[in-house]
Structure formats: structure tokens, C-alpha cells
């Protein structure tokens, strides 16, 4: 790193940031990231952007974060492309621009970045920066869901449940709700409970319904609490 190798500088920065083999030191991490980033090392540019984004070792600065995310993103780094998309989506450090957000999400999603795939699905579902298209939303949710992205699994369950952009399919809805529910997603737990309660996509099973309602209710999902009350009320 002392000899100017950008990959070594970037790795040393990460060691200081995470406190691996050295005492954790954000200022020292920044120093090495800067040296590597100035040589065009994409990962260091991205990590430097994160430091500014999170205010680690430096004052929080959206404009600087955006600058470094952009430099890494234009080199094709998917995490940087996703974060740049997020900045445009939220109007952080730049004028809010949904169409621009979509383009960066799309580039990262094409590289199988699950957060970008999920966010691209959201943009299509809501019609933000693109024409509303439930079939496209379902496509991108599925890519993210298959990589274990929990909110995408839940949203995909909803899409199958309501038949938005896909043929209505309660069994598929239950499958995706279950994957999200097992990971603790409260709304998915409630929906899965409902499927068991009503026998939609699964064999009707009141004890399973109670199990999932309980889990959702414990996380504050009001309909799960009221359905649980109704089930106990009817014995």
C-alpha cells in the first residue's frame, strides 16, 4: 500500500474501517480509501462514498457521497450503481429524479444486485420513473426473491395473491409469504396465517393460522391481533 498499489490501499482502508488486524480507525481508513480512489480504484471510491454517506470519520455529506458513488458506478460496480440510484430516488445530494434512479437500478439489477432488483420492481409497481407495469415488477421481485431478499419475497406473494401482472396463484402466494414469514417479516406472517385460516393455496389448518397470527400479532400487526381474537372467540 505504501508503494501506491491501489488494491492494497483499498484493502488496508477496509481493515482500518472494520478493525481487522488493526485498531479500528475511520480516519486512517479514509486516508487509504482516498489514495486508492484517486487512482480510480472502484471499490475504494464506493467505500469512500459510504463513509461520506454514513458520516464515518468525516462529516456526513450527501454531495460527496454522490460524487464517489458516481465514479464507482460508471466503472460498473453494482453496489455503487444501486446506491447512486437510491440517491436519485430519495433526492439526496442531487435533485430527485426517478427516471435516473431507474436507470442506475437497472444497471445494478442486470448484475444480479438483489437490492437493485427489488427497487426496480418497486419502481415498476408504483410507476415511478417508468410506466407502471406489474408484469415487470413481478419479474424483478422474483429475481430478488430467489436471492433471499425478504421484502421482495413478500411483495411477490402479494402479486400472486392479487393476480397483478401474473395469473392469480394462491399456492405461489403462500410459498413466497412463507419464505418471508420464516425470516420474521410480520406482514408475511399475517398473510400466511390468513391463507391457512381461509384454506387459500394451502390446506385449511386453524392451528397453523393461529401460529402465524401469533407471530404477526407479537410484532404489532393489528389485523393479526383481531383475527386471533376472533379465532379464540369462536373456540
Where are these regions (language model features)?
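Short helix-capping/linker turns of helical repeat alpha-solenoids
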Residues: 3-5, 18-20, 25, 38-41, ...
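Hydrophobic face of amphipathic alpha-helices that form TPR/SEL1-like repeat modules
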Residues: 11-18, 47-54, 83-90, 119-126, ...
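Long tandem-repeat architectures and their stereotyped inter-repeat linkers in very large proteins
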Residues: 31, 35-38, 42, 67, ...
Amino acid at each position: 500500500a505504501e508503494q501506491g498499489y491501489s488494491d492494497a490501499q483499498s484493502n488496508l482502508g477496509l481493515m482500518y474501517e472494520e478493525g481487522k488486524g488493526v485498531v479500528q480507525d475511520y480516519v486512517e481508513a479514509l486516508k487509504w480509501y482516498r489514495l486508492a480512489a484517486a487512482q480510480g480504484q472502484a471499490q475504494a471510491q464506493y467505500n469512500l462514498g459510504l463513509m461520506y454517506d454514513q458520516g464515518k470519520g468525516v462529516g456526513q455529506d450527501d454531495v460527496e457521497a454522490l460524487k464517489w458513488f458516481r465514479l464507482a458506478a460508471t466503472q460498473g460496480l453494482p453496489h455503487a450503481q444501486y446506491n447512486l440510484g437510491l440517491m436519485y430516488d430519495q433526492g439526496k445530494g442531487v435533485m430527485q429524479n426517478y427516471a435516473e434512479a431507474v436507470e442506475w437500478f437497472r444497471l445494478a439489477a442486470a448484475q444480479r444486485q438483489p437490492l437493485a432488483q427489488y427497487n426496480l420492481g418497486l419502481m415498476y409497481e408504483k410507476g415511478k420513473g417508468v410506466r407502471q407495469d406489474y408484469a415487470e415488477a413481478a419479474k424483478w421481485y422474483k429475481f430478488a426473491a430467489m436471492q433471499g431478499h425478504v421484502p421482495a419475497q413478500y411483495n411477490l406473494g402479494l402479486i400472486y395473491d392479487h393476480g397483478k401482472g401474473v395469473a392469480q396463484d394462491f399456492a405461489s402466494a403462500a410459498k413466497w409469504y412463507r419464505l418471508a414469514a420464516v425470516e420474521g417479516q410480520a406482514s408475511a406472517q399475517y398473510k400466511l396465517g390468513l391463507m391457512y385460516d381461509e384454506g387459500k393455496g394451502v390446506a385449511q389448518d386453524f392451528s397453523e393460522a393461529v401460529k402465524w397470527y401469533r407471530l404477526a400479532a407479537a410484532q404489532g400487526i393489528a389485523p393479526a391481533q383481531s383475527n386471533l381474537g376472533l379465532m379464540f372467540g369462536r373456540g
